[in-house]
Each structure stands twice: as structure tokens, then as C-alpha cells.
């Protein structure tokens, strides 16, 4: 059964689009995020938004997202920096699954060409039988912006070790292009 369902969306521009459509019904953001990436003296503003849509998600199904407006002009277009995307994060429970602690951390942080170090807390870890998973929702991620910049590759590391999901999309390197616009885990 669905315990919680969270809709995240965002894109390029300083005008936050806080009203979108999920499966034909309007959704209004309850939280928004903004961040600016500076590249060579040019500021690239981005926004993100969140809404709890648990009441609209009852189980497996197809979901359609529309109505997102982003800046596709200057300065984003000239630098291949236009971004738009959405993700539905669903937390479910089942008597056949073992008990798990679920932590959802959100925000918006640009990091191209620089390292972004996060130290999430609040985890409860058993002494044995550790079976952790991580999911990341990211904007951008096209191959043109996935090459190393300033000696920093697009990769996800845990305690210094680059993570590889073992899924190799043709033309990508999962260790160096972690944000390659793919869904890298099986859907349950």
C-alpha cells in the first residue's frame, strides 16, 4: 500500500512555476527551492518545487505530468543549460517486506564542475543485515554536460567510493555520468 507520494519538479529560470498538472488535476507546490549557478560570471537561476500527492496515488499506474513552464531563452539556451523535469517519489509498505527506515532529503543545489558534499543524518542502522538503497532526483544530466569540468566528474560517491548500479546505457559511463537522464534501478 502507498504510505506517501511526493511530486518534485523544477527547471531553469528565476520565475518559479508552482502550479503544474498531474494526471489532469492541478497541483500547487507547498515548498519551493531556488539556486543560482555561476559560470564564467553569468548567473543561471533554477527552481524546484514539492507537493505531497499521497491522496492522488493509490498504487501502480501511469502518471502524466504537464504544465511546467521554464526559461528556454537567455542565458540558459546559449549554454546548453535549459532544464525541466519531474519525479514522483512513492513510499510503500507491504507485510511481505522487511521493516525499513525511509529518509527523504530534499533541496536544490547546483554543482557542475565542483564537488557537492552532503552529510545526511538521522539514519538507524542495524548491526547486521544492512541493505541500504539511495535514489537521487536531478535536473539536467544530458551527455553534453556530463564530461569532467575542473577535474570533477559527474559521479555519486559513498564514503569516497564511486557507486555503480551495473546498468550500462549505451554511450554512457555509469561511474562518470551518474546523472545521465536514466532510471537506474528496477521499479518495485
Describe each PLM feature range.
Residues 12, 70-71, 141-142:
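Short acidic, S/G/P-rich loop/turn micro-motifs used as interaction or catalytic elements
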Residues 1-22:
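Solvent-exposed N-terminal domain segments of exported/luminal and surface proteins
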Residues 1-6, 65, 115-120:
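A short beta-strand-loop element at or near the start of a globular domain
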Residues 35, 45, 84-188:
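Helix-biased "structured C-terminal domain" signature
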Residues 20-79, 87, 166-188:
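Cysteine-clustered segments with highest specificity for TGF-beta superfamily mature ligands
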Residues 8-9, 66, 91:
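Short beta-strand segments
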Amino acid at each position: 500500500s502507498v504510505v506517501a507520494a511526493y511530486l518534485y519538479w523544477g527547471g531553469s529560470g528565476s520565475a518559479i512555476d508552482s502550479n503544474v498538472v498531474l494526471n489532469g488535476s492541478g497541483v500547487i507546490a507547498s515548498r519551493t527551492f531556488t539556486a543560482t549557478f555561476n559560470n564564467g560570471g553569468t548567473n543561471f537561476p533554477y527552481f524546484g518545487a514539492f507537493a505531497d500527492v499521497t491522496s492522488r496515488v493509490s498504487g501502480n499506474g501511469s502518471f502524466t505530468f504537464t504544465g511546467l513552464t521554464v526559461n528556454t531563452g537567455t542565458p540558459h539556451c546559449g549554454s546548453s543549460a535549459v532544464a525541466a523535469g519531474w519525479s514522483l517519489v512513492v513510499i510503500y509498505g507491504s507485510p511481505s517486506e522487511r521493516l525499513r527506515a525511509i529518509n527523504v532529503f530534499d533541496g536544490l543545489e547546483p554543482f557542475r564542475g565542483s564537488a557537492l558534499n552532503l552529510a545526511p543524518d538521522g539514519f538507524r542502522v542495524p548491526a547486521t543485515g544492512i541493505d541500504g538503497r539511495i535514489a537521487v532526483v536531478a535536473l539536467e544530466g544530458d551527455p553534453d554536460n556530463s564530461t569532467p569540468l575542473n577535474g570533477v566528474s559527474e559521479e555519486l560517491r559513498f564514503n569516497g567510493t564511486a557507486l555503480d548500479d551495473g546498468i550500462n546505457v549505451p554511450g554512457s559511463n555509469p561511474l562518470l555520468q551518474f546523472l545521465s537522464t536514466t532510471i537506474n534501478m528496477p521499479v518495485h
